[in-house]
Each structure stands twice: as C-alpha cells, then as structure tokens.
Amino acid sequence: MGKTMFKKTLLFFTALFFAALCAFSANADVIITGTRVIYPAGQKNVIVKLENNDDSAALVQAWIDNGNPNADPKYTKTPFVITPPVARVEAKSGQSLRITFTGSEPLPDDRESLFYFNLLDIPPKPDAAFLAKHGSFMQIAIRSRLKLFYRPAKLSMDSRDAMKKVVFKATPEGVLVDNQTPYYMNYIGLLHQNKPAKNVKMVAPFSQAVFEAKGVRSGDKLKWVLVNDYGADQEGEAIAQ
C-alpha cells in the first residue's frame, strides 16, 4: 500500500521550435535517500544524501519552501539554509546537502512545523554531436519535493504514542479525525468494512479533518495507514466513536 511521498514537477527550460525535429529526455537520475526530512530542534544540522545513478554528471539546485509549491526560490524565506544550494553530482557518485536551522523565524515549541525540501535535477546540455544530428531539443528538469518536519525537543509525547492518541468519530459525512497531538499525521488510507475512505490526507497537529465514507457508525472498526518517521507505511486500527 506504499506510495511515493514526494511529488515530481516538470519544468521546461528551452523552447521547442518544431515538435517533429525535437529529441526528448526526462530521466530522474539524481535520487534522494529517504522520503522525508525530520529536523530535531537543538540539532546543529541534518544531512540529505543524494545519489547520481547516471553515467554523466548532473547539476542540482535545492531550496526549502513553507508550503507554496509555486513560490520562486529566490524570494522564498524560511528559517533554514542549505549548503550548498547548487551542487554538481558526479556520475555514479553521491553528494550530501546540509540543512541548518537559522532561528530567523520563531517556531512553535509545542508542535511540529511543516516545510518542504525541494530538489531540481537539471540534466546536462547535449553535446555537439547530438545537436548536429537533432538540431533543436527540449530539456526537462525534474523536481522532487519532500516534507520537512521541524520537531521541538520537548513535546508531550513521542510520535509512536501519538498515533494511538488520535480519535476517530463517526459523522454523517464519514469519519472525523481528531488529532490532538503535537505531530503531523500523514494518513494515506482508511478502511471501513474493507471500503476505502475518500479525501484521506495529512492532519496537522491539534486539528481535525473529515475523511469521506458511507455508513460509519459508532463502534465500527476502522483500519488506517499512515507514513511514519522512516517513510514506511504504518498500519493500525481504531474504533469509531
């Protein structure tokens, strides 16, 4: 029931003059190790590791946004810096990026804060022989976007206990998910009588969300799946209230 937890957005860099003459390539050669980043408060920095599986070097650009996927990296302000923000990743090699919390923006100390780590994989420009053969070309960069959770040091419970504290309530619309914990609960599935609920999504700390399902009554058994700290599917059960 696993899902890839990061989104890939295609960004077009060069103009296409005639489609019939165009050569096309869109491979994500630089891979991020992991599907989420957790930044524990008080830690000097965290490392994001990259791997380039291609036979040629790649150029990558990294930045962090605060929830707007369309924000221009040049004007996005968050309390983090990435070193280096632009890096060359050699063929069949790896690269480490360092994320450091600057403290430039005060964050709540009683709950997690959510940001997004972005990586743009920019493919190399074709060589002279390729250009001579094909003429014009379309170059595509692939963007990966991962959740970054800033986690305060002294929360009221740990993340494993928090999963068990979420309350599920039967409503006419389906299931009201009441997350009165300091953690984001990244749900990816909810079953009622072996039927999947709709509108399943991440529920922020100390907030609620409705997952759409028909005929849910108090006392019914529910099965849920969420993504845990390690990026793995975590399954559990609950009784609707």
Curated annotation (Swiss-Prot):
The keyword Signal appears for this protein: yes
Where is it located?
A: Periplasm
Main location class: periplasm
Which Gene Ontology BP terms does the record give? cell wall organization; chaperone-mediated protein folding
Q: Which InterPro entries match?
A: Ig-like_fold, PapD-like_sf, Periplasmic_pilus_chap, Pili_assmbl_chap_C_dom_sf, Pili_assmbl_chaperone_bac, Pili_assmbl_chaperone_C, Pili_assmbl_chaperone_CS, Pili_assmbl_chaperone_N
Membrane spanning segments where?
none
UniProt cross-references to SUPFAM superfamilies, sorted A to Z:
PapD-like, Periplasmic chaperone C-domain
The family note in this entry says: Belongs to the periplasmic pilus chaperone family.
The record's annotation in PANTHER family points to:
FIMBRIAL CHAPERONE YADV-RELATED, PILUS ASSEMBLY CHAPERONE
Q: What does this protein do?
A: Mediates assembly of pili by forming soluble multimeric complexes with pili subunits as an intermediate step in the assembly process. This protein is involved in type B pili (HifA) assembly.
The entry's protein name is Chaperone protein HifB
Taxonomic placement = Bacteria, Pseudomonadati, Pseudomonadota, Gammaproteobacteria, Pasteurellales
